[in-house]
């Protein structure tokens, strides 16, 4: 098996619930590294397709372009489809990106919108959704996931000063920026939140989904 593996090779991971009405989740990425983990086992480390935001560098000088046009050109340079850009439509007389990653260029553009025009982009995020790349303060389109006591909620740790964390049984299909309704009767807690971080864990000790919500500490 190891002989057939190569770095940057396409990878697809599929997991979910079997049986009638089962829900499945397909994750796509590329091989970052691999090494033996036992006599008949290979450990493969893979990264998501959004890695292109960090691997792609840009050098651009733009004049008199609206911010959303600049953002679309930056995101499109990754080779990934661009689904939606929802940012203030300010026009920059001149803006330069000098051999920086796309992620860094987007941060530079966001900082310019905040510093030069006084906009608050603290709720905005960049993510790769079902239809492509988003830069928006909205949510990923799709159904609202429900996590609740006596059904699938394992633990819930609200943190008013930082990132709150809820752990549930596995939730195939849940991705960044999807809406989640958390009902924790033990804490008398019921809120509709935006998933700022999603970690699916599959293992011999059980399958869980960890959801970070309520605070976005930044990226890139």
Residue ranges and their predicted role:
Residues 1-6, 120, 129-130, 135-220:
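An acidic/polar, Gly/Ser/Thr-rich interaction patch typically located in mid-to-C-terminal regions
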Residues 59-60:
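Glycine-rich loop/hinge motif
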Residues 1-51, 162-164, 194, 198, ...:
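Assembly/oligomerization scaffold segments
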Residues 41-53, 78, 82-156:
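Short beta-strand-centered interaction patches in the first periplasmic/extracellular domains
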């Amino acid at each position: 098996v190891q002989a057939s593996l190569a770095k940057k090779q396409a990878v697809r991971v599929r997991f979910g619930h079997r049986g009638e009405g089962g829900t499945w989740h397909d994750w796509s990425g590329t091989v970052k590294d691999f090494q033996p983990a036992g006599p008949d086992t290979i450990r493969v480390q893979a990264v998501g397709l959004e890695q292109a935001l960090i691997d792609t560098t840009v050098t651009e000088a733009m004049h008199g372009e609206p911010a959303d046009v600049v953002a679309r050109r930056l995101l499109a340079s990754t080779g990934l489809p661009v689904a939606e850009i929802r940012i203030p439509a300010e026009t920059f007389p001149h803006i330069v990106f000098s051999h920086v990653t796309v992620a860094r260029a987007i941060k530079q553009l966001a900082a310019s919108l905040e510093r030069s025009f006084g906009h608050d982009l603290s709720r905005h995020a960049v993510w790769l959704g079902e239809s492509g790349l988003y830069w928006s303060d909205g949510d990923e389109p799709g159904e609202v996931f429900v996590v609740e006591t006596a059904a699938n909620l394992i633990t819930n740790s609200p943190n008013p000063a930082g990132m709150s964390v809820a752990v549930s049984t596995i939730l195939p299909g849940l991705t960044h920026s999807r809406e989640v309704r958390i009902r924790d009767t033990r804490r008398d807690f019921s809120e509709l939140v935006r998933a700022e971080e999603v970690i699916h864990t599959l293992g011999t000790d059980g399958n869980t989904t960890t959801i970070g919500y309520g605070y976005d500490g930044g990226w890139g």
